[in-house]
Every structure is written in structure tokens, then in C-alpha cells.
Design a protein with these regions (language model features):
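Extended, low-complexity cationic-aromatic segments
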Residues: 1-57, 153-156
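A short alpha/beta connector and helix-capping loop motif
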Residues: 1-16, 81-97, 116
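Short, conserved catalytic/metal-binding motifs centered on acidic residues
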Residues: 29, 55, 71-75, 104, ...
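RNase H-like DDE/DDD metal-dependent nuclease/strand-transfer catalytic core used by mobile genetic elements
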Residues: 50-96
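RNase H-like two-metal-ion nuclease catalytic core shared by retroviral integrases
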Residues: 72-73, 80, 94-118
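C-terminal anion-handling pockets and recognition modules
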Residues: 106-160
Length: 160
């Protein structure tokens, strides 16, 4: 991860020349009341095959029986194979209304995870994975309860 901010003399742009193009990492996981579950990191942008693999190998086994899975409207979430696998396992899928990140408590968890991972300034793949693991573990049940409470408040209090 590279610095998000820099310094330069007044009136000049801060420029950082990277020696190489950094590897993109994709972090995926789920949340239920009281816990985060099924974390996985890929050293690339996630593909539809990765999404299905995560559903089959990680998510379904981590869910309690007859869970309701609420997803946002990311195109990959509509993958028929993944949706069928979830339904065959006895779970229900619901989709949020479009453009509603304020109603999605996991967005607050992602914010904390990314902030903590960036804050440790990892250099290299091993250190980045360790930073992500530590950040993931830092999301407490109390945090999660707060994220769900905030989501409910956002849903019922119009913003003027």
C-alpha cells in the first residue's frame, strides 16, 4: 500500500514515482449480528469464478441454517450459479435498493478494516496480508452492533 497523502512546497503538486505497479488485492467477507465471517483475500481483482468459489467454499459453510443474505446491487452478486447454490443450501437472498450504502452495515466495517490496514503502512504482500488479518480481527461484536444500529437510524431518519 502506498501513501495516500504527501507533502510539497506551497503551490506545487506532491508527486510519488512508483518503482512498479502495485498488486491489487480484493478482500471479501460477510457480516452477521455479532461477528464477521468468511474472510478471503485475492491478490487480484475478483472475478465471477472467485465470487462463486467464495460462496461455495466459505460463505455457505459459515452461515447458520436458513439464513437471509442481504446483498447490494453489484453485478457479480446476480450470478445465477451462486444464487442457486445459496438457495439449494436452504438460505434466502434479498437485494438492497440501488445506491443505498448508508443502509449496509458492512460498509462501515470495510471502512474500519481499510483504515487500520493502511495505518500500519505494510510494505510487501506478507505484511499486507498480516495487516488485513489484524484489521479484520479488530472489528468487534460491539462495533458490529453499532454498525447495525447506525444502519437502522439511517433508514428511518430522513436527511434534510
Amino acid at each position: 500500500m502506498h501513501p495516500r497523502y504527501g507533502y510539497a512546497p506551497k503551490g506545487q503538486r506532491a508527486v510519488v514515482k512508483l518503482k512498479s505497479r502495485p498488486t491489487r488485492y480484493t478482500l471479501i467477507g460477510a457480516m452477521r449480528i455479532g461477528s464477521m465471517l468468511a474472510p478471503r483475500v485475492w491478490p487480484r481483482a475478483m472475478t465471477a469464478d472467485d465470487w462463486v468459489r467464495w460462496i461455495l467454499e466459505d460463505l455457505i459453510s459459515a452461515l447458520k441454517p436458513r439464513s437471509i443474505i442481504i446483498m447490494d446491487n453489484l453485478n457479480i452478486h446476480y450470478n445465477g450459479y451462486a444464487l442457486d447454490a445459496i438457495k439449494e443450501a436452504g438460505h434466502t437472498v434479498l437485494f438492497q435498493s440501488r445506491y443505498s450504502p448508508d443502509f449496509n452495515p458492512i460498509e462501515m466495517a470495510w471502512s474500519k478494516i481499510k483504515t487500520l490496514a493502511r495505518g500500519s503502512r505494510p510494505r510487501g504482500a506478507k505484511l499486507l496480508r498480516a495487516a488485513i488479518t489484524d484489521a479484520w480481527s479488530a472489528v468487534t461484536p460491539r462495533d458490529i452492533d453499532g454498525y447495525f444500529s447506525q444502519t437502522i437510524e439511517n433508514a428511518w431518519q430522513p436527511k434534510c
